[in-house]
Amino acid sequence: MKNLKMVFFKILFISLMAGLAMKGSKINVEDLQKFSLHHTQNNLQTISLLLFLVVFVWILYMLTRPKPVYLVDFSCYLPPSHLKVSIQTLMGHARRAREAGMCWKNKESDHLVDFQEKILERSGLGQETYIPEGLQCFPLQQGMGASRKETEEVIFGALDNLFRNTGVKPDDIGILVVNSSTFNPTPSLASMIVNKYKLRDNIKSLNLGGMGCSAGVIAVDVAKGLLQVHRNTYAIVVSTENITQNLYLGKNKSMLVTNCLFRVGGAAVLLSNRSRDRNRAKYELVHTVRIHTGSDDRSFECATQEEDEDGIIGVTLTKNLPMVAARTLKINIATLGPLVLPLKEKLAFFITFVKKKYFKPELRNYTPDFKLAFEHFCIHAGGRALIDELEKNLKLSPLHVEASRMTLHRFGNTSSSSIWYELAYTEAKGRMKEGDRIWQIALGSGFKCNSSVWVALRDVKPSANSPWEDCMDRYPVEIDI
């Protein structure tokens, strides 16, 4: 029976194939051409519509996609050697100023000098940081003229080197963003730069003031937004802080801390949205994350410029500062994490979150391993305690925070520009390789915590006149606390 079925299907198959062969033998080339033409004519409108949609979607994508932002180069200001001071020299200046009656005028105020000396000894600052000329002469010069002189030397020094290294002409700059927190004269620092370098009349310039040590990342984010709107142009970001005008000569201890930490420094950064600059750029900007917790009174008031009881202006740092900084940092990390962490870390974080919320409230929060997302960390060199805390909470190794510690040791707290000195350190050490990811993170008054993420487009070598050129062979150093 089975054999009969097989024979039947074979006969049926052969018959069908024979029929098709006979039919096909009657179809010639002309018939095939007519068939093709008929179907093409019938579907011409459909084909045209599909082609139009493809072209339209492609054009729409090209017009609306975020434009890449490249970091062509950056320059950190290296002050002249005559501005270099050791801790002993600095405290000698303080005692001399007190004896001359310029500050802390009574003998009972000796403890204020001792208080600052103790902070300096434990600060992580080295013996070669810089203070401006106005604070090294007697009587002290803290007026507008001395303050302008310091700022001009820093900004013009960084910009001159940047233009020299990149070959970009000032007339090519279409966007300028300057940030300086406490020194904001009229005309603005941005206008001062426009005047000095004769920048073009239609330049888009902004001057950010009062935004603290995290303003460098804010300035980059603002420039990034402008580069999305204005095509085929360069943007310059300048980050600095003025020390001359901000030396506090009163007796409020919470205001004396800034005297011990802040030093002369500044940086200029050249950004571009021109596709042809990719070949020579060092980095591409991947993400910026900005967190501002100023709606909370404790956050808003933890670092405030104000007058003391004697009418002397200074910056007050409250006891809430560490708690506020930790909270703001936590929000920034929670926002940045999903953008940069690998899937495995995201899942671990999510599972822990669900367990803690619904099953075990006592369970500790999961800290993602950001070492899987970044090769290099540029943590704002605001102070030894800040670096220690981030190293501990993010479970980083001493190598990961080396750039921050060495920047604090060599240059002190240079405010918003410190993250650029740290990036320059990493380059000078020859550690920056193609594809490496960098996390710049800065905290500042307001209270704010801001992050920028970069990726290296090539093996990056230090630029000419790097601030580390004259001392790289001596770093890293052991820091005794």
Curated annotation (Swiss-Prot):
The keyword Aminoacyl-tRNA synthetase does not apply. Its EC number is 2.3.1.199. Pfam families: ACP_syn_III_C, FAE1_CUT1_RppA. Keywords: Acyltransferase, Endoplasmic reticulum, Membrane, Transferase, Transmembrane, Transmembrane helix. GO terms for molecular function: fatty acid elongase activity. It is found in: Endoplasmic reticulum membrane. Residues 61-358 form the FAE domain. Gene3D superfamilies: 3.40.47.10. It comes from the Eukaryota. The active site is at residues 213, 292, 376, 380, 409, 413. It catalyses: a very-long-chain acyl-CoA + malonyl-CoA + H(+) = a very-long-chain 3-oxoacyl-CoA + CO2 + CoA. Pathway: Lipid metabolism; fatty acid biosynthesis. GO terms for cellular component: endoplasmic reticulum; endoplasmic reticulum membrane. It is a multi-pass membrane protein. Induction: Repressed by herbicides such as flufenacet and benfuresate. Down-regulated by darkness, low temperature, drought and osmotic stress. The chain crosses the membrane at residues 4-24, 44-64. Expressed in leaves and seedlings. Disulfide bonds: none annotated. GO terms for biological process: fatty acid biosynthetic process. Belongs to the thiolase-like superfamily. Chalcone/stilbene synthases family. This is 3-ketoacyl-CoA synthase 8. It comes from Arabidopsis thaliana.
